[in-house]
């Protein structure tokens, strides 16, 4: 499914019955969250709230919600066609493309080189193109015009500290880097032109800010936030794109057309020309504020902590812009649906590094990253433990995975009944559990003894080989194949 920008994507979703317009007035304070949550849990469409209301005042800008509320729409956002509801297969193809780009193998001969050339050529041809004028700069607010109260920013949960910008694509660049960093960081509104930028210390934006402080102490750090970006660029920011290409280049590859970029009015940062709303401004080194609490994807309110304040100097936008928003809460929520889809992208990446892996699953109930189940073709004693540590260290997306369960390839890891059977019949609690202490842990994980630092557990639920056990290992009960065929033939005559 190829598309030009967010508006074209919305139009195509609506034509397919994947987007519903809400004409009735809906309050951005809690009501919008409740409606979006009910629709998402029912597997419903994306929502365009045409008449949002904030504090009793009608807002002029509509709100787009649940854009990635199903894995099917995530696949569509990645430019894939979803036939007969099968979203897994096209996303595996995206994963195979990423694995090729991440570690391209040298051609094995002239024929192989000829077959790989179209992919490489397409990647090279998708370098973004800079334009001088752009739809996202059709309207400009500066000075006293800058007022976040004019935007329909959601207040998602009763215990939230303030309205929260959720789907903001944050654009930064470190002093020693040519390439811009794109990241999704939530932002608490604390004034008409001030938000708290909640980026964790290891995230790209925070690293760029730290390097800027070291290289240019005391100088403001330019930051831009895009609200309402094309889906491919948003998804590129949360996908393990190889360092050899930019997120903008990868987005063009998904969308089937080069990403057009325009330089911001107040800095050299570049944003997609088709963006709906753009916030331009700076972060001052000594400007910090306590952020939170907020209801998060864990299903709990998080702790309050200090983060930098982003001062907005200018807001540019399209005529009649659309504000893109979401909420996070106990799974399933939109991040959980995104996690289900990205799970399929991860599988080919892992298999490229570990061919013995047959499947990989991040259950949404585990916040889509805290627990992983892996099936593999075991080849030697200790093999499961090697796979555990390999997953923890391979992609930064798995740095916060607290639990990894490894099973043999005879177990369907998408079926908890089979996983529990394997765990209860193939695991000795002492021999088959591996504990690793003092490892990076999600800052939001209040179960860890120290914020950002905790332990991980690996569980080897594979059949044990000689050397791993001294006992005779059990053989699974399997019915004779000929008997099963015979019963299949007579089944209709049994009156059952």
Curated annotation (Swiss-Prot):
The gene is ubiD. This is 3-octaprenyl-4-hydroxybenzoate carboxy-lyase. The active site is at 296 (proton donor). The keyword Flavoprotein applies. Belongs to the UbiD family. Prenylated FMN binds at residues 184-186, 198-200, 203-204. It catalyses: a 4-hydroxy-3-(all-trans-polyprenyl)benzoate + H(+) = a 2-(all-trans-polyprenyl)phenol + CO2. Pathway: Cofactor biosynthesis; ubiquinone biosynthesis. Homohexamer. It comes from Azoarcus sp. (strain BH72). Binds 1 prenylated FMN per subunit. Catalyzes the decarboxylation of 3-octaprenyl-4-hydroxy benzoate to 2-octaprenylphenol, an intermediate step in ubiquinone biosynthesis.
